[in-house]
Each structure stands twice: as structure tokens, then as C-alpha cells.
Amino acid sequence: MNFNSLRKEITSNNASVKELVNDFFVKIDHKDSKINSYICTTKDNAIAQAEDIDKLIQNNEKLPPLAGMPIAIKDNICTKGVATTCASNMLKNFVAPYESTASSKLWSSGGICLGKTNLDEFAMGSSTETSVFGVTSNPWDINRVPGGSSGGSAASVAAGFCAAAIGSDTGGSIRQPASFCGVVGLKPTYGRVSRWGLVAFASSLDQIGPITNTVSDAAEILHSISGKDPFDSTCLDKPVPNYLTDLNKSIKGLKIGIIKECFEHPGLNPEVKESVLSGVDRFQALGAEIIEVECPRFNDGIATYYVIAPSEASANLARYDGVKYGYRSNEGSNLIDMTSKSRAEGFGDEVQRRILIGTYALSAGYSDAYYKKAQKVRTLIRKDFDNAFKKVDVLLTPTCPTTAFLKGDFVNDPLSMYLSDLLTVPANLAGLPAISIPCGFDTKGLPIGLQLIGNVLEEDRILNAANIFEIDAHVIKKRPLF
């Protein structure tokens, strides 16, 4: 159920907030064993939050904007008093001593926390297969992955186990699973939402954002969690607009740029290409002007990302040494031996792989050839976007080259797995807002996502375009049966 449907239930007195929240837990208890979208649920706290909202309703008091909306949180975002594991053996028993800014703003806005969702370990992956708590399944086909790293968040929304979820996006980790699961996923401008309380992966790329059933729900959450934060020096001190104001504005005359390089890439699945191009035709029928643009270095984004992100990860994850917190090995005759064993036993294969890549890229004699060169290419990618936005208002691409793949397909082929992020990483490298919306299905019945990229702090523009498309695209409003 989306926010508006839930509000109708509440305001018409068909159900109390407590009853609605309890219904979600009943569904989770009965069905999440098939999906494994949650690492843990927080039923007692959720019921208490729901009762508080019910009291406000009974007393005819003004309700906060997200009053009674059941929301799940990706388990790399700190929630005070609740385990924040990053789906890793390293933090399996870590309980956060403070609340992240983003989740704190959600609860202040009346949102209700249902629990913490599964992810790839430390958010490093594209399939949610590397979690120490097990693989998450795609509700559209439980033999397939939900995408990653926010796969648990996307799967929980698609399965109806929450009304919305919060994820993090470093190279596509909100948008790619949103595409695979047939829901909406928004990565805001870098700095639009505070990263305080988000366990760091790659600090110049990470961003928190919503995964929802509808574009308007994403706009509501973005409005609630955005804004300056004294705890995050990278958080922008810019006014936060009401993203709902212009959602229904006509897009007649909107200039949408079709990035030529994306549609010519040999890895793009023909069914995905056909569906997204049909979406382009729909935008044109709605009054948008379609313009082909070139971003010559767009496809260099994936190689650039897989130097920069592991480099930053190797520095950020150096703190997990078994001394202050996190997993500590019982073996080791001295500090160095204990630290080495703690990291070897605490981190999974993919995390260790990325730490090694990053350490190598930053090492003496190689940083010029790899890390510094990647930063130069990153600047060129941003310049390509700058040039494109001189001609158009919004850019359009497929979200992913393919639909959801089978579990295990790329477990032993990390390079092919990395290509899942081919079309999403450039927006992270440039710090731009981007949204994935459903645009159709392939012949197997699997969802296909369409990505809209906006200029810096122009979330309102991509939300408007996405919402008009969503309203028009009645044919794709299906839900998975599992």
C-alpha cells in the first residue's frame, strides 16, 4: 500500500494505525521466510509509535506529515538501541548508540520503524547475496536476486512488507534494486541528505534515499529527510523545497536528453532497450521534447568507480580491527596477528576483495596510475553532464542493462556483477540526483526500470517528470505474487 491508501484507511476510521502496523507484521511473519528481506523487526517499538499516533488522532491534534507510515531501514543506517550489522560478521552484534539524522527525521515526521532490511555486506554488491544473514529473494521470482546493495529494502517494498524503505546508494544501490523489484528508487544530490549515521563505504559517493511504491511517496520522504545537518560537513546548507508542489505540473516542453552511449552499449539487453525506448515515446506523447545527447565518457564511469569506491572503502574500513568494536578473533598471539585474523574472519570475500583493490590503487607507486587518474576521469564525466544540461533539462537512460538475474549467476564472476552498475554509477561520480521508475516488463514477467538524471539539486524536476510518467503508465501497475 502507498501512503495515500494508508491515509484513507486511517482517516476514514477503517483501521487504527496500530491495527495497520500489526497487519504488516502479520504479513512479514507469514511470508518473509520466502524473501528474507528483513534482518530484524522492531515490533514492540513500532506498536508503541503507532499508539502515539492513534492518541493524536483521537485528540484531534495536528498530525506530522508521515504520521503512521510504516517504514523499513537498510541495516547500514544507525538506529539507536537496535542492531546495525551491515550484514557482516564484523558487526553482527553491534548495537548503534545513536540515531542517524535521516532516520531521526523520519520518526520526527511520524514515520514508524518496522525493522532493518538485508543488504550486501557493507553495501558492497549488486545482488544482496553476500549478507551473513543469507540471500534475499526477488518477490517477482524467488529464484532471482532483488538487486543490491539495498536489495532487502526494495524487496520489502515490492512484497508489501512495508509502505516504504530507506536505502543507501553509492553506485546504484537504491536504483538498481528498485529496477529489479519494480518499485521507485531515488538517489538525491550528494549532500542533500545527511550521511550522519550511515556506515561509510565510499564517503564521496554514498547517499541516503527512499525506495517506495510511488513517486509521490518518494517526494514525501525526501522532503522529510533533507536539509542541513551540523553533524555532516558535506551536507548542503540549501533550502528544502516542498517536492510535492510541482509533482503534477505539465511536462509539455520539458527537454529530455537520451544519452546516445547508453543505448549503443553491447551489454544492453534488447528487451530492456525496447521497453525504455517505449517509455521515451510515452514521454514524447506527454509533451516532452526528446533530444539525443552525447556523454563520451559515460561508459568510462564503471572503471572509474571501481577504482575510487574501493580506495575509499579501504580507508573507511581500516577502523574495523577487533580492538575498539566489531568482531574480534579468539586467536592471535599478538596485536598484529589478532587484527589480521579478526579482519580475515570478520569480512566476507567481496569486502576483502574491494579492500585489496583499494589498498593497491592507493599504494606508493600506483596511486598516480590508478586513483589520481580515476579522479581526473571523474572530473571529465562531470563536465560531460554539465555540457549535456546546457541542452536539456533531464537525462534518460535504462536503469540497468538487464532484468533481475538468477541467484548464483555471478558469484564467481565479479566483473560481470560489477557491470550491473554500468548505467547508475555516473550519477554518483557527478553527485547528481537520479530516480528509477518502472517502465515495463520483459517476456519472463520481470520488471524493467527507466532512469531519469537531473542537474544538481533539481530533484523536483525529475520527480515531476517521473510522476507524470507514472500516472500515465497504468499498464505497469502490477504487484508480484509469491
UniProtKB/Swiss-Prot annotation:
Belongs to the amidase family. GatA subfamily. One of its GO terms (molecular function) is ATP binding. Keywords: ATP-binding, Ligase, Nucleotide-binding, Protein biosynthesis. Allows the formation of correctly charged Gln-tRNA(Gln) through the transamidation of misacylated Glu-tRNA(Gln) in organisms which lack glutaminyl-tRNA synthetase. The reaction takes place in the presence of glutamine and ATP through an activated gamma-phospho-Glu-tRNA(Gln). One of its GO terms (biological process) is translation. This is Glutamyl-tRNA(Gln) amidotransferase subunit A. Its EC number is 6.3.5.7. Pfam families: Amidase. Heterotrimer of A, B and C subunits. Transmembrane segments: none annotated. It catalyses: L-glutamyl-tRNA(Gln) + L-glutamine + ATP + H2O = L-glutaminyl-tRNA(Gln) + L-glutamate + ADP + phosphate + H(+). One of its GO terms (cellular component) is glutamyl-tRNA(Gln) amidotransferase complex. The active site is at K74, S149, S173.
